[in-house]
């Protein structure tokens, strides 16, 4: 589930920044960092992001789909009906749970990952490749 979150959040780009203010590999919001912590430091960002993901997994009783929704929309989302989730959270849980399920089954392909890429993920990954100096696959 860790790799799924990092894929959706940043495509592995430790310098990713969102318009909402989230930063780094796990797109962690500023209020999750202690004063003086560097949110762009991959280790610090991963620590804060994974702590929040662990909290979401705990609150969801280990339900990956609910934990993904909580990671994206806030822990309180876990207790709400999906009908009350923000559209972004619904999409995040949909893509994330499918990508995670495929990875958990050691699938060599993922229709859900392909769908996420077509829905905008490819642009995120292209930006990550360019920023990190990684050539696209031929």
Language-model features: locations:
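Short acidic, glycine/proline-rich loop/turn micro-motifs
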Residues: 18, 39, 80-82
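N-terminal secretory targeting signals
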Residues: 103-138
